């Protein structure tokens, strides 16, 4: 199995277009090797030829340009991307579909909830259904795509930002709102969870002893943006666990015996993005890596 991290940041990328917080300022200036990041997405392949895109980032074209394995290989029109799977209906997971409207065949896999969101917005009709088949999946039921077995499962989260005003106050939404994904090539198994609001018993059981987990690294602390004075929203309000703290991700994973743990979907304010920071040192000392754009993993 090959995995390429196309993008590693949360919504808006790093730095966000209007952000001047300390973490973002380093990225603007590229100080001390600080890396800029596009919005989170990975590409996965069982054979190095057919690729599955997990979430379609608004930065899709930039990510393709940076990834030769995903360039056209033959004929006048071609793409090694054979399928796209969506783990939520968030803007930073679906907007990239609009950059995939050039009549290129691929399969689009998503929950019925997310496919309904796409169907309700006619702008996504530009992704021609004659070429792009929209295929609903069932939670916890494996589907085989390009030699990979993909199993979507529910995790705690919330409705997409653009649907909050229509949620009737139920921000958590349905079980199909926020998903994780197990990726299996019969020899290796990887879990991809870019958004998660809480660690549950079911999730602990699923991840215990895992070979590799990509996990929500949005914020270092729950009130990070509040303390910076740029938002009144906590991580919990946005549907994300924080990395630090007694209920945070580092603590939650400590007893799970996961061999390799990588934070992804990192918000532009997160101090862990600074490789010189004490937060980064704490994450590394706890056995965590911080994803960066272009990271490649071969299993």
From Swiss-Prot:
The keyword Transport applies. It comes from the Bacteria. Pathway: Cofactor biosynthesis; pyrroloquinoline quinone biosynthesis. Keywords: PQQ biosynthesis, Transport. Signal peptide: none annotated. It holds the Pfam family Lactamase_B_2. InterPro entries: Metallo-B-lactamas, PQQ_synth_PqqB, RibonucZ/Hydroxyglut_hydro. GO terms for biological process: pyrroloquinoline quinone biosynthetic process. Belongs to the PqqB family. May be involved in the transport of PQQ or its precursor to the periplasm. This is Coenzyme PQQ synthesis protein B. It comes from Xanthomonas oryzae pv. oryzae (strain KACC10331 / KXO85). The gene is pqqB.
């Amino acid at each position: 199995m090959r995995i390429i991290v196309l993008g590693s940041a949360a919504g808006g990328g790093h730095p966000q277009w209007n952000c001047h917080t300390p973490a973002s300022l380093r990225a603007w200036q590229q100080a001390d090797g600080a890396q800029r990041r596009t919005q989170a997405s990975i590409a996965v392949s069982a054979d190095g030829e057919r690729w599955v895109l997990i979430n379609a980032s608004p930065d899709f074209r930039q990510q393709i340009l940076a990834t030769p394995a995903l360039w056209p290989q033959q004929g006048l029109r071609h793409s090694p991307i054979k399928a796209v799977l969506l783990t939520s209906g968030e803007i930073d997971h679906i907007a990239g579909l609009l950059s995939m409207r050039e009549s290129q065949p691929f399969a689009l896999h998503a929950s019925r909830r997310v496919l309904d969101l796409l169907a309700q917005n006619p702008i996504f009709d530009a992704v021609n259904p004659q070429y792009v088949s929209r295929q609903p999946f069932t939670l916890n039921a494996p589907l085989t795509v390009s030699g990979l077995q993909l199993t979507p499962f529910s995790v705690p989260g919330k409705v997409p930002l653009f649907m909050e005003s229509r949620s009737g106050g139920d921000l958590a939404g349905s079980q199909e709102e926020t998903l994780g994904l197990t990726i299996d090539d019969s020899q290796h198994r990887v879990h991809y969870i870019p958004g998660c609001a809480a660690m549950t018993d079911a999730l602990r059981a699923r991840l215990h002893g895992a070979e590799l987990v990509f996990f929500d690294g949005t914020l270092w602390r729950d009130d990070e943006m509040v303390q910076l004075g740029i938002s009144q929203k906590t991580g919990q309000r946005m549907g994300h666990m924080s990395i630090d703290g007694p209920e945070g991700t580092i603590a939650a994973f400590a007893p799970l015996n996961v061999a390799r743990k990588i934070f992804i979907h990192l918000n532009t304010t997160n101090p862990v993005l600074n490789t010189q920071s004490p937060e980064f040192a704490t994450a590394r000392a706890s056995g965590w890596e911080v994803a960066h754009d272009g990271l490649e993993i071969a299993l």
